[in-house]
C-alpha cells in the first residue's frame, strides 16, 4: 500500500535525517517569527543558538540545508535584509574565491601529494619519526594549501593501503568488500586490528598537523583570510604577527606527537605490522614499474606548480582565489585534463562548503543588525587591554570547539573592527586582538570534529568506519593535543604576543593598518 501524501512529504523533508531532528527544525521555524515580534534581541540569539545546533549536528544533516532554511526565514521576517546579506558576501568575496578555486586547484595536484605521503609511509620504519613526518608534512602543506584537501589526500592513501591488505587478508581479490571481515581468519584479524590502530594514529597526527600549519598563514584556513582582510595584512605580515603564538604552539604540538607515540597514550603507539609492510611494499614496487614517462612528467609539472603557488602566495602576486585559478589552468593544461566532467569533479569538495559559508554571512548580517554581540564586546572592552586578549582568545576557543571556526572567527573580528572604528580600542590593540581571535579560533577547535572542517571531513569519510574511528574516539585521541595547543596558545597570548609584536614593529618588520 502506498504511503499518504503527508507521510511522503515528511520523508522527503531533510531525507534520511532522524525524525526528532526534523521536528526540532520545524519547531525552530515556527517559533522564531513569534519570538522576533516579542523581543528581537532574544530571537536573534535564539537563531544563533539554532544555527550552532545545526553545525553541531552536522553528522545528522549537512548544515547547509537546516541553516539555509533558518537564514531564509530570518530575511523574510526582517531580522536582516537581502541587501545586507549581499554586502556581507561582497565584503568576503576573497574567501569565497579561495574556497572555489584554491581547493579545486589543489585537486589537480593530488598525484604529487599521494606520491609524497606514500613515500613517507614506506620509507620510514620508526613509528615516532613517521608520525612526526606526517604531522610536519600536513602542517607545511596546510600552511599553503587547503586543510581539507590535505586530509583528503591522506585519507586516499590510507583507504588505498587498507584496501590492498584487506584484499590479501580476505583472499577475495577485486570482489572484496572492505567493510566485511567475515572471510578473514583469526590470525589476519589480529594483524588487521593492529593496522587499523596504526592508521588511526597517523590520521589524527595528520589532522592535528593541518591545524598547526593552518593557523600560521592567511591561506591556511578560510577564517584566516577574513581576519587578514579586516586587519589589512598580506601573507608575510600575517605570518610574522601570528608567529609569537603559532611557533611555540607548533613546537609543543610536535613534542606532544612524539610523547603520545613514545608512551602509547590515548590510543597512539601502534606500529605498522611487518606482514602489512611487505604487502604494501610489493604493491608499491609494482606501481612504480608501471609508471610511464608521461606519469613522471605529470609529477614534475605538479611540483613546479607547487613552487609557483608558494611563491605567488608569499609575494602576494594576486588575490588568493585568483592564484588558485591559475593553478587550475596550469595543472589541467600541462597534465592533459581537458574533459569538462573531469574538471568539474575538482569543485565537488568545495562548493557545498562555499554555499554554507554564504549562509554564515547571512547569520553574521543578523548579528550585526540586531547588535547581538554588543553586550559581550562591551564586557570584554571594560577589562584591561592585557585581559582583553585573554578573554577574546578564550571566548573564541570555547565557541570554536563546538561550532564552526569560520563562523566564530567572522563574528569576533567584525565586532573587534567595529570597536576600533568607534574609538573604543586603539589600532595597536585591534591588531593584537586579531591575533588572539585567529589563534583562539584555530587552536582549541581541534577538541571536536565540529570545530575543524578537516576533522569533520575525516569523520564522515569512507575511511572512518574501516579503521573504527568514531566521534568519541576522535575526541579522545585529540584530547592531549587540545590541552597542549589551548594552554600553550593561551600562555603565548598572555605573555609573548605583545612584547614580540612590539619588538618586530620597532625592527621595521611589520606593516601597520592605515
From Swiss-Prot:
Transmembrane segments: 23-43, 63-83, 97-117, 120-140, 144-164, 202-222, 238-258, 303-323, 357-377, 391-411, 447-467, 475-495
Keyword field: Antiport, Cell inner membrane, Cell membrane, Ion transport, Membrane, Sodium, Sodium transport, Transmembrane, Transmembrane helix, Transport
Topology of the protein relative to the lipid bilayer: Multi-pass membrane protein
Localization (cell): Cell inner membrane
A molecular function (GO) term: sodium:proton antiporter activity
Protein role: Na(+)/H(+) antiporter that extrudes sodium in exchange for external protons.
Name of the protein in question: Na(+)/H(+) antiporter NhaB
Amino acid at each position: 500500500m502506498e504511503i499518504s501524501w503527508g507521510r511522503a512529504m515528511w520523508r522527503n523533508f531533510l531525507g534520511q535525517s532522524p525524525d526528532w531532528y526534523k521536528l526540532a527544525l520545524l519547531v525552530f521555524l515556527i517559533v522564531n517569527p513569534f519570538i522576533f515580534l516579542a523581543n528581537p534581541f532574544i530571537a536573534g540569539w535564539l537563531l544563533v543558538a539554532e544555527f550552532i545546533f545545526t553545525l553541531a549536528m552536522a553528522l545528522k544533516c549537512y548544515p547547509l540545508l537546516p541553516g539555509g532554511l533558518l537564514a531564509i526565514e530570518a530575511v523574510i521576517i526582517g531580522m536582516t535584509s537581502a541587501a545586507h546579506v549581499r554586502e556581507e558576501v561582497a565584503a568576503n568575496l576573497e574567501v569565497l574565491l579561495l574556497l572555489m578555486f584554491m581547493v579545486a586547484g589543489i585537486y589537480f595536484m593530488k598525484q604529487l601529494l599521494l606520491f609524497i605521503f606514500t613515500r613517507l609511509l614506506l620509507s620510514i620504519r620508526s613509528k615516532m619519526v613517521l608520525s612526526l613526518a606526517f604531522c610536519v608534512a600536513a602542517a607545511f602543506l596546510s600552511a599553503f594549501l587547503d586543510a581539507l584537501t590535505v586530509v583528503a589526500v591522506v585519507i586516499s592513501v590510507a583507504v588505498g593501503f587498507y584496501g590492498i591488505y584487506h584484499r590479501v587478508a580476505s583472499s577475495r581479490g577485486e570482489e572484496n568488500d572492505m567493510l566485511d571481515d567475515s572471510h578473514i581468519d583469526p590470525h589476519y584479524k589480529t594483524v588487521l586490528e593492529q593496522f587499523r590502530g596504526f592508521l588511526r594514529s597517523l590520521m589524527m597526527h595528520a589532522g592535528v598537523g593541518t591545524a598547526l600549519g593552518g593557523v600560521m598563514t592567511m591561506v591556511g584556513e578560510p577564517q584566516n583570510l577574513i581576519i587578514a582582510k579586516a586587519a589589512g595584512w598580506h601573507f608575510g605580515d600575517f605570518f610574522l604577527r601570528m608567529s609569537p603564538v603559532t611557533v611555540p604552539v607548533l613546537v609543543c604540538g610536535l613534542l606532544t606527537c612524539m610523547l603520545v607515540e613514545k608512551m602509547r597514550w590515548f590510543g597512539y603507539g601502534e606500529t605498522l605490522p611487518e606482514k602489512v609492510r611487505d604487502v604494501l611494499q610489493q604493491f608499491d614496487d609494482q606501481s612504480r614499474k608501471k609508471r610511464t614517462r608521461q606519469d613522471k612528467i605529470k609529477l614534475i609539472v605538479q611540483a613546479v606548480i607547487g613552487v609557483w603557488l608558494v611563491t605567488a602566495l608569499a609575494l602576494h602576486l594576486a588575490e588568493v582565489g585568483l592564484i588558485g585559478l591559475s593553478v587550475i589552468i596550469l595543472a589541467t593544461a600541462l597534465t592533459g585534463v581537458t574533459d569538462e566532467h573531469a574538471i568539474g569533479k575538482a569543485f565537488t569538495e568545495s562548493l557545498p562548503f562555499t554555499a554554507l559559508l554564504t549562509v554564515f554571512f547571512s547569520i553574521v548580517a543578523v548579528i550585526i543588525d540586531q547588535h547581538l554581540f554588543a553586550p559581550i564586546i562591551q564586557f570584554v572592552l571594560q577589562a584591561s587591554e592585557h585581559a582583553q586578549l585573554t578573554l577574546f582568545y578564550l571566548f573564541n576557543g570555547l565557541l570554536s570547539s563546538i561550532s564552526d571556526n569560520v563562523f566564530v572567527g567572522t563574528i569576533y573580528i567584525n565586532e573587534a573592527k567595529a570597536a576600533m572604528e568607534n574609538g573604543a580600542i586603539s589600532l595597536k590593540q585591534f591588531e593584537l586582538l586579531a591575533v588572539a581571535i585567529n589563534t583562539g579560533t584555530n587552536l582549541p577547535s581541534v577538541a571536536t570534529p565540529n570545530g575543524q572542517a578537516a576533522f569533520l571531513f575525516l569523520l564522515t569519510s569512507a575511511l572512518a568506519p574501516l579503521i573504527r574511528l568514531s566521534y568519541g574516539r576522535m575526541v579522545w585521541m585529540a584530547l592531549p593535543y587540545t590541552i597542549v595547543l589551548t594552554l600553550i596558545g593561551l600562555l603565548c597570548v598572555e605573555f609573548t604576543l605583545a612584547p614580540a609584536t612590539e619588538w618586530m614593529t620597532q625592527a621595521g618588520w611589520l606593516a601597520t593598518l592605515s
